[in-house]
């Protein structure tokens, strides 16, 4: 599943290419792609027709396009709304041609002739329209309001998150994956952050010191910034930017996917274990398991 860096790469591409443009035609090719929009496909297409894209934003793994209220071509007087995009496991926001047309679930034609397509092979992602609401000093779509801030958010408060983690009596990795504690971190970057901080993912969050928790959160922010600079992590053709190009941070991973390889820090053989129906990768020497 795309995590924060991959979603931010897509957002930046959309910011550069679609802001200021108006949707002149919209077609839903697969109803599952708009299942989160409770009013249905016809309502979504009608409300998007003539809508002007005024900006882009993101929180965690969700991104959205801000739409001008009451687009002049429609005469509507809607409240400020956003087109919320969740990429799911394999969603892509593509401009221009698409390599596999059969995977296109939604398409929108912009006023300059550009086609914006939502392709999704596994159909876990989708689009929905939502009102923008004010939450904790930020304006976000209502379906995103429950998410915590992510480590790259300018208003992310490390001390406040540490305080929350100090009260959690479950594994630190479980907490990193909880989007209501800190958003944007998935399995890949959780393993990378824990490796950098020399903390085993099975350690109970409440037993870690403030310094250790701070190190984990700082490492998460650092590794995601580095991944963002390299276009994100792409293990296959499913994770691409708006131009269909893959990222290459997978070549720089220190923990994830490196079972049986030597730790780049101490030389021990990296291990893999099951955790929450996922795989966790760690160094047994740098990140010793907690005692039972």
Curated annotation (Swiss-Prot):
Record-listed E.C. numbers: 3.2.2.23, 4.2.99.18
Top-level taxon of origin: Bacteria
Record flagged with keyword tRNA-binding: no
Reaction it catalyzes: Hydrolysis of DNA containing ring-opened 7-methylguanine residues, releasing 2,6-diamino-4-hydroxy-5-(N-methyl)formamidopyrimidine; 2'-deoxyribonucleotide-(2'-deoxyribose 5'-phosphate)-2'-deoxyribonucleotide-DNA = a 3'-end 2'-deoxyribonucleotide-(2,3-dehydro-2,3-deoxyribose 5'-phosphate)-DNA + a 5'-end 5'-phospho-2'-deoxyribonucleoside-DNA + H(+)
Residues the record marks as active site: 2 (schiff-base intermediate with dna), 3 (proton donor), 61 (proton donor), 278 (proton donor)
Chain segments annotated as transmembrane: none
GO molecular function, one term: 8-oxo-7,8-dihydroguanine DNA N-glycosylase activity
Keywords on record: DNA damage, DNA repair, DNA-binding, Glycosidase, Hydrolase, Lyase, Metal-binding, Multifunctional enzyme, Zinc, Zinc-finger
Residues holding DNA: 103, 122, 168
Pfam families named in the record: Fapy_DNA_glyco (PF01149), H2TH (PF06831), zf-FPG_IleRS (PF06827)
One GO BP: base-excision repair
FPG-type zinc-finger residues: 254-288
Cofactor list: Zn(2+)
Record's cofactor remark: Binds 1 zinc ion per subunit.
Role noted for this protein: Involved in base excision repair of DNA damaged by oxidation or by mutagenic agents. Acts as a DNA glycosylase that recognizes and removes damaged bases. Has a preference for oxidized purines, such as 7,8-dihydro-8-oxoguanine (8-oxoG). Has AP (apurinic/apyrimidinic) lyase activity and introduces nicks in the DNA strand. Cleaves the DNA backbone by beta-delta elimination to generate a single-strand break at the site of the removed base with both 3'- and 5'-phosphates.
Summary of subunit composition and partner proteins: Monomer.
Family that this chain belongs to: Belongs to the FPG family.
Name of protein: Formamidopyrimidine-DNA glycosylase
Naturally occurring in which organism (per UniProt): Mycobacterium marinum (strain ATCC BAA-535 / M)
